[in-house]
UniProtKB/Swiss-Prot annotation:
CDD domains: Ribosomal_L7_L12 (cd00387). GO terms for cellular component: chloroplast; ribonucleoprotein complex; ribosome. This is Large ribosomal subunit protein bL12c. The gene is rpl12. It comes from the Eukaryota. Gene3D superfamilies: 3.30.1390.10, Single helix bin (1.20.5.710). The lineage of its organism: Eukaryota, Viridiplantae, Chlorophyta, Ulvophyceae, OUU clade. GO terms for biological process: translation. One of its GO terms (molecular function) is structural constituent of ribosome. Keywords: Chloroplast, Plastid, Ribonucleoprotein, Ribosomal protein. It comes from Tupiella akineta. Belongs to the bacterial ribosomal protein bL12 family.
Length: 129
């Protein structure tokens, strides 16, 4: 019989009060918390994955796609497009003719959200992908 099996056999003989005292002493001795995680979630150790479960990496770069611009808001959207990019007036106007089109590519989530907010306030329909 291994040491672990012997310990398990001894644990089986403990009363509920003795078990509670054992848990308290283990917590104090090793500086751990034996209480269940909040919400009852089970945490897996880093690197452990369930069989058949795919690892999904969080996306770090985003594209801002202008899908449509209301005709009465075109001028205000042009101003925002010029502010967000280095496009001149003619290039910005040409950009708005053939939509949907990516305005900014490979940018951070925060930058994409800010660009989307500015464009939508100006009157554009925008997606972040």
């Amino acid at each position: 019989m291994t040491t672990v099996e012997q310990i398990i056999d001894q644990l089986k003989t403990l009363t509920l009060i003795e078990s509670s005292e054992l848990v308290k002493q283990i917590e104090e001795t090793f500086g751990v918390d034996a209480s269940a995680p909040v919400g009852g979630a089970i945490m897996m150790a880093p690197g452990q994955e369930s069989a058949g479960q795919e690892v999904v990496e969080e996306k770090t770069t985003f594209d801002v796609i202008v899908k449509d611009i209301a005709s009465d808001k075109r001028v205000s959207v042009l101003k925002v497009i010029r502010k967000l990019t280095s496009l001149g007036l003619a290039e910005a106007k040409e950009f708005t003719v053939s939509l949907p089109k990516a305005l900014k590519e490979g940018i951070s989530k925060e930058e994409a959200a800010e660009a989307k907010k500015d464009l939508e306030l100006a009157g554009a329909v925008v997606d972040i992908v």
